[in-house]
């Protein structure tokens, strides 16, 4: 991952995200990384129906699917988990660069 993205995770404890190929044609998908209070990192892929995003509708937990979720111990393990989820770690950035909806 890029240094600025690594710094976002470690210094500001901010979320990072990247678009990924959705498993369903009528869904959009992202991988996001969330720093946890424990010092670990949650790496998750989510898929959301396109119509909810395109129509700017509110959606909830039940509207999303999570084809991948993993907790990793350190920032050094994030790249591997992100690859497992189907994304190149170099594409990770602040959520607004990938239109991450959460």
Task: List the model feature ranges, each with a label.
Residues 26-33, 82-83:
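Short, charged low-complexity linear motifs
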Residues 31-60:
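A short, structured beta-strand/loop element
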Residues 1-7, 52-102:
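Mixed-charge, Lys/Arg-enriched low-complexity segments
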Residues 1-28:
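Negatively charged, low-complexity tracts enriched in Asp/Glu with abundant Ser/Thr
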């Amino acid at each position: 991952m890029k240094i600025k993205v690594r710094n976002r995770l470690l210094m500001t404890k901010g979320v990072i995200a990247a678009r990924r190929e959705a498993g369903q044609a009528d869904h959009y998908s992202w991988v996001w990384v969330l720093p946890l209070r424990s010092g670990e990192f949650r790496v998750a892929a989510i898929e959301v129906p396109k119509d909810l995003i395109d129509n700017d509708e509110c959606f909830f937990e039940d509207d999303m699917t999570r084809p991948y979720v993993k907790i990793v111990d350190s920032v050094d393990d994030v790249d591997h988990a992100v690859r497992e989820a189907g994304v190149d770690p170099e594409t990770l950035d602040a959520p607004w660069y990938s239109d991450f909806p959460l």
